[in-house]
Amino acid sequence: MNSAVLNSFAFVKGASFLSAFLFLFLAGCGASIRWRLQNLHLWDSWISTVFVNIFSSFLIGYLIAANPASEVVTILGVGFLGSLSTFSTVIMQSAKTIEDREYWLTVMILGLNIVLGVLFAYIGLRLG
């Protein structure tokens, strides 16, 4: 793999093929796990999204607190946890509730994702 492709990942200077592979593989795993969890239909889809996002926020906080190498943060934090959590789904679910004139649900979806996401990231930082 040429250096221009590796540098496009913008991990750290001199990122290796293994780093790029792990990043892409774990990003795919994170997105697949999120998709599977949301399709279990245990709750309304917005509730699943809240759970996945606060879980990911906690793990990102915990990871950052462990102070690993920047490449590890990129691979695990951005690759896996970034694709496990989802901002775009929150926005699409919120837009759908606005379209359906369920404004209270819109506020709840946005509020829970933001407030609980920040709270659980903080808890992860404190426990890490």
Could you describe each region identified by the protein language model?
Residues 2-128:
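Membrane-interface helix-loop junctions in multi-pass transporters/channels
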